[in-house]
């Protein structure tokens, strides 16, 4: 037996058991509208949204966040005022739940943005397409208003906060957007100035910026809140606190911070006329 054959037979060149790790697969989750919101809405369907999530991703598209659910609940409840007939844009959309909800309850236009990562954008487009497929499969005989029968007014775009937003403004017809959604993005403390700048640049006259977040890093809660100071000092936004809701923590970390990490806070930003 040659030396090479001897080494090979001894297992030196055998591949470790975990050498061929299976590729991580996309996940899934779902969201159900609250019955009281459906009952009060002109738009009775869909009542449920099936969402594809990315495989584990450093940009966090693999989770359906509490803030996204709460954002959707609030916009469903207040759709007459905030959504119906409005132009809507979402930053850092992840799976896109709030944007999909806005389309379903009568938004005129919805632009869904996230960091220009191929997996994130593909996943968002998948969820837009799935919204229509789910509608077609379940509601062929539905006679009520049906925005989900046509998703052509929904667009998915890559966007880096603080970068040139002229294309997004052009997509709005040059007017800007009536509602800018920032759902669970203020934990990016280094990006606050860019977030504020882009939100103001894309906002239509009289428009609103809806900010919802959870303090995932409880010890940095004050830095989360600093977003609102910067929004006032750097862009002239006025902030109104709308709610703080007890949910559950997204991550199991320090027991002593569990209470704060369970909270979801909502604010509305407007510019002085």
Curated annotation (Swiss-Prot):
CDD domains: AdoMet_MTases. Keywords: Cytoplasm, Methyltransferase, S-adenosyl-L-methionine, Transferase. One of its GO terms (cellular component) is cytoplasm. It is an enzyme of class 2 (transferase). It comes from the Eukaryota. Its main location: cytoplasm. Its EC number is 2.1.1.-. GO terms for molecular function: N-terminal protein N-methyltransferase activity; protein methyltransferase activity; protein-lysine N-methyltransferase activity. The keyword S-adenosyl-L-methionine applies. Belongs to the class I-like SAM-binding methyltransferase superfamily. EFM7 family. This is Protein N-terminal and lysine N-methyltransferase EFM7. It comes from Yarrowia lipolytica (strain CLIB 122 / E 150).
């Amino acid at each position: 037996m040659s030396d090479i054959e001897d080494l090979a037979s001894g297992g030196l060149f055998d591949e470790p058991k975990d050498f061929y790790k299976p590729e991580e697969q996309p996940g899934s989750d779902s969201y159900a509208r609250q019955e009281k919101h459906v009952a009060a809405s002109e738009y009775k369907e869909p009542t449920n949204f099936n969402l594809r999530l990315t495989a584990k991703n450093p940009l966090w598209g693999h989770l359906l966040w509490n803030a996204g659910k709460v954002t959707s609940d609030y916009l469903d409840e207040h759709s007459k005022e905030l959504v119906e007939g409005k132009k809507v844009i979402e930053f850092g959309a992840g799976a896109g739940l709030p944007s999909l909800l806005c389309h379903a309850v009568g938004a005129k236009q919805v632009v869904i943005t996230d960091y220009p990562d191929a997996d994130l954008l593909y996943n968002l487009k998948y969820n837009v397409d799935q919204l229509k497929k789910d509608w077609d499969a379940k509601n062929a005989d539905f006679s009520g208003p049906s925005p989900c029968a046509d998703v052509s007014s929904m667009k998915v775009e890559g966007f880096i906060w603080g970068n040139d937003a002229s294309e997004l403004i052009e997509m709005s017809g040059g007017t800007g957007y009536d509602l800018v959604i920032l759902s669970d993005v203020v934990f990016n403390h280094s990006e606050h100035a860019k977030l504020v700048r882009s939100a103001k640049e894309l906002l239509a006259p009289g428009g609103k910026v809806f900010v919802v977040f959870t303090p995932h890093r409880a010890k940095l809660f004050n830095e989360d809140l600093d977003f609102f100071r910067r929004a006032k000092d750097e862009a002239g936004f006025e902030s109104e606190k709308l709610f703080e809701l007890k949910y559950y923590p997204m991550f199991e970390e320090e027991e002593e911070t569990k209470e704060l990490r369970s909270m979801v806070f909502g604010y509305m930003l407007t510019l002085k006329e």
